[in-house]
Regions:
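C-terminal motif of bacterial Sec signal peptides marking the signal peptidase cleavage site
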Residues: 14-17
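Extracytoplasmic c-type cytochrome modules immediately beyond a signal peptide or single-pass transmembrane anchor
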Residues: 25-129
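Sec-dependent signal peptide recognition
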Residues: 2-8
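Disulfide-rich extracellular modules and peptides
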Residues: 20-21
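The canonical Cys-X-X-Cys-His
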Residues: 76, 106, 131-146
Length: 147
């Protein structure tokens, strides 16, 4: 009888000690996942002053253009530069995670060689980025080396 009571008591303690709720799941931060579709990851960058991180995605033509260190994207190239605010990771000291989506910039070249630039963000009314400068910035990226 004593063994049965002891087993029940230990089981009760074990079950109740594991039911602690985690009240600060996300610390009030919203994290958005970007779906690149058929575009592949090319490179990334970090801006500590603005506390942002960016990832450059593109198709095969974009990868070829950046690998050749061209000044302009090849015909058919599509590139998207996705920028997020970053935050300290509450689960790992010294780590960062993506947070609020800041902007999605797109550069693409049509079959005639015309280069178009578009940006989606909340700040487009107050600040219009220089198209030529942004295209040069895109073309300054170097693809990460893959094993």
């Amino acid at each position: 009888m004593k063994n049965t009571i002891l087993i029940l008591l230990v089981s009760l303690v074990a079950l109740t000690s594991c039911s602690k709720e985690n009240n600060d799941k996300d610390n009030g931060l919203s994290r958005i996942v970007f779906d690149p579709g058929n575009l592949k990851f090319i490179s990334n960058s970090l801006n500590p002053k603005k506390e942002t991180m960016s990832a450059l995605y593109g198709n095969e033509k974009a990868l070829e253009s950046l690998s050749k260190e061209s000044q302009t994207p090849e015909v058919g190239a599509v590139m998207k530069l996705v920028t997020w605010k970053y935050h300290d990771n509450p689960q790992y000291i010294g780590g960062t995670i993506t947070g609020e989506l800041v902007s999605i910039e797109t550069v693409q070249t049509d079959q005639s060689g015309n280069i178009s630039y578009a940006v989606k963000d909340d700040l487009t009314e107050s600040s219009s980025p220089d198209k030529e400068e942004r295209i040069k910035y895109f073309m300054s990226y170097r693809p990460v080396s893959r094993p």
